[in-house]
C-alpha cells in the first residue's frame, strides 16, 4: 500500500527497503499487542489450552495456558507486510505462502491436540510430514519456476562450489523439514524458541538484504540476486510480531505459539537461508535449534543401539530441567548462545 503510494505521489521515502522494514517491524509489534488480549480472552473461553506431556511433570502447572498464539503473530505479520511491501515481488509472495502454509499445517496439528486434550494426538507423524513436504515442494517449485539460481555456496568461499540444478529441489525440501521440526522441538519452555527466532530472523534478514543489494554484495564478495532484498520487509514484520508475542510469551508465559507458530517460523527461516545462499551458515545462525535437534537424534540413536540414554531427557532443555536448573536460567542461557552464534555468523560474511 505505502509502496504503491510512493510511486503515485513520487515520495522517495517509502521507496527505501530499510524504511519500510522498520515500519513493518513497528506495525507488526503493535498489532500483536492489540490482537493478543482479544485472542487470549477467546482462547480461555474455549479452553484452547496446551496439552502437557505426562513425561514432563514440572510443566503440569502450564496445562491451562492457551496455545496457538502463532496464529496471532502470523496474522499481524501478513497485515503489516501488505501495508508496506512491494506486492509485485515474486519472492515476497513465495515467502508469504511459505509462512502461511507451514502455519496451517501446525494449526491443523494444534486443533487436533486441543480437541482431544492429548499432546500425542493431532496429526500423525506421517500425515504431518506429508503436509510439510507438500508445502516445501510448492515453495521450492515456485523458486525454480521464478528462475532463482541454484548454485551452492559455503562460508569463507566467494564463488559457488557447484550448481545443484534440479537437485536443489530435494535438498531444499529436506532443509524445510529439518528447520521446521528443529524450531518445533525447541519450543518447550517460555520464550525459549521466540528470542532465538527473532535473532535468527535479524541475521538472515541482513544477509538477504545484502544479497539483493548490488553494491554491498559486490563489496562483501557475496552472491547478488536481484529482487530478494524486498523480503527483508516481510522478515522484519515477522520479527516485530514475535517481539510483540514475546510480551506475552516470556516467563511465566500467558500464551504458547503452538505448532502453528513454530512450524511457520521454521519454514520461513529455511526460506530466508535459501534466498541468502546461507544453507550451510544456517547451522551457526540456528545453532540453538540444531543442538536441540541433535540431542534428540543422539538420545534416540544411543537408546536403540546401546539401550542407554545420553541425556536425562531430550530435547536438551528438558535435560537441564531434570538437573534442577531454574527454567528462566535455561531460557536466558539459550538466548545468550543464540546471540553469540549469530554474531559469529555475521562476522563470517567479511571473511572470504
UniProtKB/Swiss-Prot annotation:
Pfam families, per this entry?
Answer: Glycos_transf_4
Q: What are the GO BP annotations of this UniProt entry?
A: cell division; cell wall organization; peptidoglycan biosynthetic process; regulation of cell shape
Protein name, per record:
Phospho-N-acetylmuramoyl-pentapeptide-transferase
Its Gene Ontology cellular component terms are: plasma membrane
The coding gene here is mraY
State the membrane topology.
Multi-pass membrane protein
PROSITE patterns, alphabetized: MRAY_1, MRAY_2
Organism of provenance: Sulfurovum sp. (strain NBC37-1)
Q: Which keywords belong to this entry?
A: Cell cycle, Cell division, Cell inner membrane, Cell membrane, Cell shape, Cell wall biogenesis/degradation, Magnesium, Membrane, Metal-binding, Peptidoglycan synthesis, Transferase, Transmembrane, Transmembrane helix
Give TM regions: 24-44, 65-85, 87-107, 129-149, 159-179, 196-216, 227-247, 255-275, 280-300, 329-349
Where does this protein act, in terms of pathway?
Answer: Cell wall biogenesis; peptidoglycan biosynthesis
Q: Which NCBIfam families match?
A: mraY
InterPro entries this protein is in? Glycosyl_transferase_4 (IPR000715), PNAcMuramoyl-5peptid_Trfase (IPR003524), PNAcMuramoyl-5peptid_Trfase_CS (IPR018480)
Cofactor(s) it depends on: Mg(2+)
Amino acid at each position: 500500500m505505502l509502496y504503491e503510494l510512493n510511486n503515485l505521489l513520487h515520495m522517495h521515502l517509502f521507496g527505501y527497503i530499510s524504511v519500510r522494514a522498520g515500519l513493518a517491524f513497528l506495525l507488526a509489534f503493535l498489532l500483536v499487542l492489540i490482537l493478543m488480549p482479544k485472542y487470549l480472552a477467546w482462547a480461555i473461553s474455549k479452553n484452547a489450552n496446551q496439552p502437557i506431556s505426562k513425561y514432563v511433570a514440572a510443566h503440569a502447572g502450564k496445562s491451562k495456558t492457551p496455545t496457538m498464539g502463532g496464529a496471532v503473530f502470523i496474522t499481524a505479520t501478513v497485515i503489516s507486510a501488505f501495508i508496506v511491501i512491494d506486492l509485485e515481488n515474486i519472492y515476497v509472495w513465495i515467502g508469504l505462502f511459505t509462512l502461511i502454509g507451514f502455519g496451517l499445517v501446525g494449526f491443523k496439528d494444534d486443533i487436533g491436540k486441543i480437541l482431544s486434550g492429548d499432546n500425542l494426538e493431532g496429526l500423525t507423524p506421517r500425515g504431518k510430514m506429508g503436509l510439510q513436504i507438500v508445502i516445501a515442494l510448492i515453495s521450492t517449485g515456485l523458486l525454480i519456476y521464478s528462475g532463482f539460481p541454484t548454485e551452492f555456496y559455503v562460508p569463507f568461499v566467494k564463488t559457488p562450489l557447484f550448481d545443484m540444478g534440479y537437485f536443489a529441489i530435494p535438498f531444499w525440501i529436506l532443509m524445510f523439514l529439518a528447520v521446521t521440526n528443529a524450531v518445533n522441538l525447541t519450543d518447550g519452555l517460555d520464550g525459549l524458541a521466540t528470542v532465538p527466532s527473532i535473532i535468527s530472523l535479524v541475521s538472515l534478514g541482513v544477509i538477504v538484504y545484502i544479497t539483493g543489494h548490488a553494491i554491498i554484495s559486490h563489496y562483501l564478495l557475496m552472491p547478488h540476486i536481484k529482487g530478494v532484498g524486498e523480503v527483508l520487509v516481510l522478515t522484519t514484520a515477522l520479527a516485530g510480531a514475535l517481539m510483540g508475542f514475546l510480551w506475552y510469551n516470556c516467563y511465566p508465559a500467558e500464551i504458547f505459539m503452538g505448532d502453528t507458530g513454530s512450524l511457520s517460523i521454521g519454514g520461513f527461516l529455511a526460506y530466508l537461508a535459501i534466498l541468502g545462499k546461507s544453507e550451510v551458515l544456517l547451522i551457526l545462525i540456528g545453532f540453538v535449534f540444531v543442538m536441540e535437534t541433535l540431542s534428540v537424534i543422539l538420545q534416540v540413536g544411543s537408546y536403540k543401539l546401546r539401550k542407554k540414554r545420553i541425556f536425562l531427557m531430550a530435547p536438551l532443555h528438558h535435560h537441564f530441567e531434570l538437573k534442577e536448573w531454574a527454567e528462566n536460567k535455561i531460557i536466558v542461557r539459550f538466548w545468550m548462545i543464540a546471540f553469540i552464534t549469530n554474531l559469529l555468523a555475521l562476522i563470517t560474511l567479511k571473511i572470504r
